[in-house]
Regions:
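Divalent metal-cofactor coordination and adjacent catalytic microenvironments
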Residues: 1-84
Length: 84
């Protein structure tokens, strides 16, 4: 199955990626797309079929995918977690 967004979508809708972000972003596109499919399946929906019937939903899925990937990339993974 195809991802709901592409690397070009990330760079167009968010920002140019740094070289060290490229491979992580590519993997995240698949993870996020599959997560959205899973959530739809949990409520008895086939997201790919729904998207094939609606250009608007296709764009929403793209937007959500880019947003989640961008937020994940902005989250630091090389520092200690904060504690109270």
């Amino acid at each position: 199955m195809n991802d709901f967004a592409t690397m070009d979508d990330i760079q167009t809708l968010w920002r140019e990626l740094k070289p060290e972000e490229m491979s992580r972003a590519k993997e995240l596109l698949t993870v996020v797309s599959e997560s959205l499919r899973y959530e739809a399946e949990k409520v008895g929906r086939n997201l790919d079929q729904m998207i094939s019937n609606s250009e608007s939903l296709k764009n929403v899925a793209k937007s959500v995918t880019v947003d989640v990937v961008a937020r994940t990339l902005m989250t630091s993974t090389d520092t200690e977690p904060m504690t109270q």
